[in-house]
């Protein structure tokens, strides 16, 4: 089966946004996972920033991965993907000018869409890891992203954290981002349908949710009715791969089965703990 062109996959993603339906993403962290996801019928995949950091660096989601490293992984996937790939481009790897560079590089990598978030990254001294930048700065970064895009079919999605804001603040932000001309709004931290409905009535473009398999947000028809077109429910496939690797190697060494689950294994074998210590010691960052 021939691999579709980047332009075709971007058009496919646009069709998903315009379909009136809600789709779940596959966690596509390397070329094989992307091809498996397409063969199993997934309509869209996502390369998560946290997953890329673990896969490339064995590092936690502390904005340690560089644009070049992330783009290299996206390029490997984009070279053979048979479904549209969303790239979690974090904060665009810096200020508005860095965002422009991010757009250029990820567009060349072949992604169908990418998200740019308003989190203050990398975390600053004395700040929380979930702090957000001022809305004016975020608007400037989104305008820069749209300016840098060459293929107008590639979708640019603005992301914010509704769990760190009041409902009124969230509405104010998404309205400001929508006015810039982005192709969608991505939100993390939506608690339930009441929370979603209060915000979604102010959004006239497609919505993407990072829901982490929230049991309060599992009614796909109701999600679609509220404008939600894409839902990210975590990266179970990636963590299952970690667990499978551990179990295979453990059995080859004749070691008895342990009690660690996939999440605990990723913590044990990543550099999470030392980075937490360093962040608290040198930057006074609070999670």
Curated annotation (Swiss-Prot):
Enzyme Commission identifier(s): 4.1.1.112
HAMAP family named in the record: OadC
Similarity comment text for this entry: Belongs to the isocitrate lyase/PEP mutase superfamily. Oxaloacetate decarboxylase family.
InterPro entries: ICL/PEPM, Oxaloacetate_deCOase_bac, Pyrv/PenolPyrv_kinase-like_dom, Pyrv_kinase-like_dom_sf
Cofactors, names only: Mg(2+)
Identification of the protein by name: Oxaloacetate decarboxylase
Coiled-coil regions, chain positions: none
Annotated signal peptide: none
Annotated GO MF terms: magnesium ion binding; methylisocitrate lyase activity; oxaloacetate decarboxylase activity
Organism encoding this protein: Marinomonas sp. (strain MWYL1)
Binding-site positions, substrate: 50, 159, 235
Binding site for Mg(2+): 88
Pfam families in UniProt: PEP_mutase
Cofactor note: Binds 1 Mg(2+) ion per subunit.
Keyword annotations: Decarboxylase, Lyase, Magnesium, Metal-binding
Subunit (UniProt): Homotetramer; dimer of dimers.
Domain of life: Bacteria
Reactions catalysed: oxaloacetate + H(+) = pyruvate + CO2
Role: Catalyzes the decarboxylation of oxaloacetate into pyruvate. Seems to play a role in maintaining cellular concentrations of bicarbonate and pyruvate.
A Gene Ontology BP annotation from the UniProt entry: pyruvate biosynthetic process
């Amino acid at each position: 089966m021939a691999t579709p062109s980047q332009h075709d996959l971007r058009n496919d993603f646009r069709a998903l946004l315009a379909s009136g339906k809600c789709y779940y993403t596959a966690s596509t962290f390397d070329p094989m996972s992307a091809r498996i996801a397409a063969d199993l019928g997934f309509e869209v995949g996502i390369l998560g920033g946290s997953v890329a950091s673990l896969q490339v660096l064995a590092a936690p989601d502390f904005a340690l991965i560089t644009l070049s490293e992330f783009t290299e992984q996206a390029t490997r996937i984009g070279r053979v993907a048979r479904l549209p790939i969303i790239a979690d481009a974090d904060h665009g790897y810096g200020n508005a000018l860095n965002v422009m560079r991010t757009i250029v590089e990820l567009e060349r990598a072949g992604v169908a869409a990418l998200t740019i978030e308003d989190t203050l990254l990398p975390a600053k001294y004395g700040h929380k890891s979930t702090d957000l930048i001022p809305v004016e700065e975020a608007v400037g970064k989104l305008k820069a992203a749209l300016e840098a895009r060459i293929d107008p079919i590639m979708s640019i999605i603005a992301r914010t954290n509704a769990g760190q804001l009041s409902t009124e603040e969230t509405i104010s932000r998404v309205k400001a981002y929508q006015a810039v001309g982005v192709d969608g709004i991505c939100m993390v931290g939506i608690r339930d349908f009441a929370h979603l409905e209060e915000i979604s009535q102010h959004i006239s473009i497609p919505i993407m949710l990072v829901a982490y398999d929230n049991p309060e947000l599992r009614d796909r028809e109701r999600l679609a009715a509220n404008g939600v077109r894409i839902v990210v429910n975590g990266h179970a496939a990636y963590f299952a791969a970690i667990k499978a690797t551990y179990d295979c190697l453990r059995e080859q060494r004749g070691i008895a089965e342990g009690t660690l689950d996939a999440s605990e294994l990723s913590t044990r074998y990543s550099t999470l703990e030392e980075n937490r210590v360093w962040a608290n010691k040198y930057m006074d960052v609070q999670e």
